Amino acid sequence: VVHAPAAIAFTNVRVVSMISESRLDDQTVVIRDGRIESIEPSGSNPLPVDATVIGGRGRVLAPALIDMHVHLLRADLPLYLKAGIATVRNMWGHSAVAAIKRDIESGATLGPTVHSVSNGLDGSPPRWPATRLVNDPRDAETAVQEMVAAGWPALKVYQQLSAESYDSIVAAAKRRNMDFMGHVPTAVTVLHALESGQRSIEHLSGYDRAVTRRQGMGTFAWADVDPSRFGELVRRTIEAGTWNCPTMAIFVELSRNHTASDRASIIANRRLFVAELQRQGARLLAGTDAGIDVVSPGSSMHDELRELVAAGLTPYHALRAATKDAGEFLRVPGLGTVTVGAPAELVLLDGDPLASIENTRRIAGLTVRGSWYSAAALAALGSR
């Protein structure tokens, strides 16, 4: 382990910047004080005298991964780091998450950088603990003000909201220039959510009802869809500027309790829809729903990337959804790239992830907020 703000020099690495698909071979990357200080051909300049040198011959330096949909638990923090994830977006805020975030930021606890939305704003009956019920649209203003007071920068909208409550939450959010994201409530069409300016849609929620031939199947409406509806929905999504975090891998697990043919259709049709999002240029984020029972925190991100490639994305575009594009969504300049001035959230790999997405699993080490953890140091981190 080498702790920030010390200088660290990675020598003779192949750099995957994520700015484009091109790689830079035989580079020296110097990080200091949590930032990337320089990227130069190895040997072109003397190394900083105070730098710890990490030899990277035959290795690839890429941005650390960003899991854009987690439900954060303290016990899981090491699992994210072991998987090369240095940043997470927590998708249900509550006091325990606020405490974890504070402890990580103060240095009291080691974990990924945490971005979080508010408590879920939902109607009755609530599905999860720490729900803020908004059964009366007139209560939306108060509910949103409570979330602001609690320090949450964005709102989470959820499944059981009435159309009226959803619209009232949207209006309260817009008065504050505040993002809202999450599910498309059952009472709201996906087109209405897009027109309302929902910033991200999780799990392709709402699209299922718009494309299915079998209403009333909930999330598993994907078993029987009309693909001729995909194109226009995606066009409208791009027009609205809404991002999608499709959480593909968890549906591979959740669909196991369906018939074999329905399961195969659910997986295939979700892949087809994601392929259309990518083909038209809609914005995609890689997220796992980690913290939900069927998903393993950390390792599930590699499953998610594999699923995005199975949907037809190139390894580069799949990886962008977990690096550069995620950083753009989070509005952190440079995050998810290997560029000068960017946050030093980097992963050293024993293979090129643009050649095969499976290489994201071959982790030789990770920098988190500018501190370096070798594979051995990561392996030694406590796990549940």
Predicted regions and their residues:
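Extracellular/periplasmic ectodomains of large secreted or surface enzymes and adhesion receptors
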Residues: 1-8, 12, 372-384
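Acidic, glycine-enriched loop/beta-strand segments at the rims
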Residues: 2, 15-28, 41-42, 296, ...
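Mature N-terminal segment immediately following signal peptide/propeptide cleavage
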Residues: 3-38, 55-68, 72
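Divalent metal-coordination and catalytic microenvironments
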Residues: 13, 29, 34, 58, ...
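A short acidic/small-residue loop/turn micro-motif
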Residues: 42-47, 69, 380-381
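Divalent-metal coordination cores built from histidine and acidic residues
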Residues: 56-61, 72, 76-192, 196-257
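Histidine/acidic-residue-rich catalytic or RNA/ligand-binding cores of hydrolases
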Residues: 190-198, 211-214, 250-260, 270, ...
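His/Asp/Glu-enriched, well-ordered alpha-helical/loop segment
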Residues: 264-349
